[in-house]
Amino acid sequence: MRFLRRFFQLESSSGILLLIFAMLAMSLANSSLKSHYFNFLDIPIVMQFGTFAIDKSLLHWVNDGLMAIFFVLVGMEVKREMLEGALASYRQAVFPALAAVGGMVVPALIYVLITRSYAELSNGWAIPMATDIAFALGVVALLGARVPLPLKVFLLALAIIDDLGAIVVIALFFSEQLSVPALTIAAFSIFGLLVLNRMKVGHLCGYLLFGGILWASVLKSGVHATLAGVIIGFSIPLKDRRGNRLLHAFEHTLAPWCSFLILPLFAFANAGVSLGSINVASVFSPLPMGIALGLLLGKPLGVFGFCFLAVKLRLAKLPEGVDFKQILAVAVLCGIGFTMSMFLSSLAFGGESTSTINTLSRLGILLGSGLSAVIGYLLLRAFTKPAEN
């Protein structure tokens, strides 16, 4: 028990847990238990209330349900940083914002250039845009006090803006044919959340009620359900009517569940890549190469390039105590797409988890993310000094 308590208190524990669950999924997907693993993910689960029903496989419940809860946390984090954190002013936000834009645009361009001759792969351009903040911060935490605090804050702010970009991409490009009745119910739910926000209600029950209705209606509307999570997160007031820091309290409560349950389960459900049908030629085919190079080369080129230009053009300043070599190391770590890239892959290509296109997409994510983690760690270790006692 003491060991477990100490483990969960480590900064790197969430990243380690993600890696363990991803490796477990890979092991099962390439063992004699392969069919049981994929059949387990395809188990149908039905939620019914009168004539209203949601019939999804376990995999879809993880991707549409549990990840919506994760995006509630994302919404709260973004709101807090915009109100009183690293994004609270133009001067604070401009440097990580430009870095995030570069880190989204360049990987997408590299993917498009590599896959431009294959129309069936065109939907995957957003996959290498993402950064898995839990994994990236987990790698940074392995170096402990060697890493300057301003550099950690820069990475966190960059990743939060990256999440905002992912939210916009999901809303604009991965919504299906829209249902007006479902959107109408969603609008009423949002109104209810706004009323709770304006009244600074401090009880969780109202947010859960309207949030649950919002999630179900958005799921049925054709807009991806994770957007409901973001809206719920933004609806939580910074303080309740008594002055209690409500947003911080909810965020503090939800964060461990996301780090130690939801994201590991997502990794377990999505990282299982069966390598039986994959050969050397397929590894170097356009889809995995477009994703892997987008993450491994596009992310550092975009993040570092935009940072360098921003400083040289005097649009922004380097964080205090941080140099360009350290920015380069963090830029490489931003290539750890992992869970967020897999999530965008599931939206881009859908279909069965065992389909060839999904297998190759996940292979590219694992290659790009894994190499980015190793190279980023080595660079950051080389470019930082041991902390003085």
UniProtKB/Swiss-Prot annotation:
Task: Output the superkingdom of the source species.
Answer: Bacteria
Segments traversing the membrane = 7-27, 58-78, 94-114, 125-145, 154-174, 176-196, 199-219, 260-280, 291-311, 327-347, 363-383
Looking at the UniProt record for this protein, which Gene Ontology cellular component terms does it annotate, in alphabetical order?
plasma membrane
- Answer whether the UniProt record assigns the keyword Protein biosynthesis to this protein: no
One MF term in the entry's GO annotations: sodium:proton antiporter activity
* Annotated S-S bridges: none
Query: Function of this protein?
Result: Na(+)/H(+) antiporter that extrudes sodium in exchange for external protons.
- Could you tell me the keywords of this UniProt record? Antiport, Cell inner membrane, Cell membrane, Ion transport, Membrane, Sodium, Sodium transport, Transmembrane, Transmembrane helix, Transport
Q: From the Swiss-Prot or TrEMBL record, give the protein name.
A: Na(+)/H(+) antiporter NhaA
| Topology relative to the membrane | Multi-pass membrane protein
> Coiled-coil intervals in this record?
none
Instruction: Name the family.
Output: Belongs to the NhaA Na(+)/H(+) (TC 2.A.33) antiporter family.
- Catalytic activity, reaction form: Na(+)(in) + 2 H(+)(out) = Na(+)(out) + 2 H(+)(in)
Origin organism of this chain? Actinobacillus succinogenes (strain ATCC 55618 / DSM 22257 / CCUG 43843 / 130Z)
Q: Which HAMAP family match?
A: NhaA
Which residues does UniProt assign to the signal peptide?
none
Some GO term, biological process aspect, for this entry: which one?
A: regulation of pH
Q: Where in the cell is it found?
A: Cell inner membrane
